[in-house]
Amino acid sequence: MSYGLDSGDVLEAEDPFIILLVEDNNAHAMLIMRAFERLGFTGRIEWLRDGKAALDYLRLHEGGGRSLPRMVLLDLRLPKVDGHEVLSQIKRSERLRAIPVVVLTTSTSDDDLRRAYSNHVNSYLIKPLSFEDLKRTVEEIKEYWLGWNRSPGPA
């Protein structure tokens, strides 16, 4: 499992399932990564600590030649660029918009919830996270993603 950005790696199509975790709180990020270890997750987690770094990472991968993450776990309260703006830019990009985004936040604000869903977030989980909620959400989205990208078999 990768706990940071390996900016020199060029990823191939057969690379593992990659999750981009955008979380500025070290303790929260470690808990999330430990939860994935408990789930037996065999993919990679790329952990970035602010919204600007996330947008830079996505722009680099958006241009082609590098595999896009298959899921983004996104905090809303981030330094440099907030999570709402990151979500908005992901969903406005033709190449990025299909990436499922799960908001992980301490915010219970109706305004944050409305803004996230108006920007087409796939799921909205409130911290502290239940291991079961995180597991269910990630498994459902992973199944959707893999099913959506699967080519139809021979007729």
Swiss-Prot record:
Induction annotation: Transcriptionally regulated by FilR1.
Protein modification: Phosphorylated by FilI.
GO biological process terms, semicolon-separated: phosphorelay signal transduction system
CDD domains: REC_Rcp-like (cd17557)
Domain Response regulatory positions: 18-142
Modified residues (4-aspartylphosphate): 75
InterPro entries to which the protein is assigned, alphabetical: CheY-like_superfamily (IPR011006), Sig_transdc_resp-reg_receiver (IPR001789), TCS_response_regulator (IPR052893)
Pfam families from the UniProt entry: Response_reg
Keyword line: Phosphoprotein, Transcription, Transcription regulation, Two-component regulatory system
KW Transcription regulation (keyword) present: yes
Keyword ATP-binding in annotation: no
Disulfide-bonded cysteines: none
Role according to the record: Member of the two-component regulatory system FilI/FilRs, which is involved in the regulation of methanogenesis.
PANTHER family: RESPONSE REGULATOR RCP1-RELATED
Protein name: Probable methanogenesis regulatory protein FilR2
Species assigned in the record: Methanothrix harundinacea (strain 6Ac)
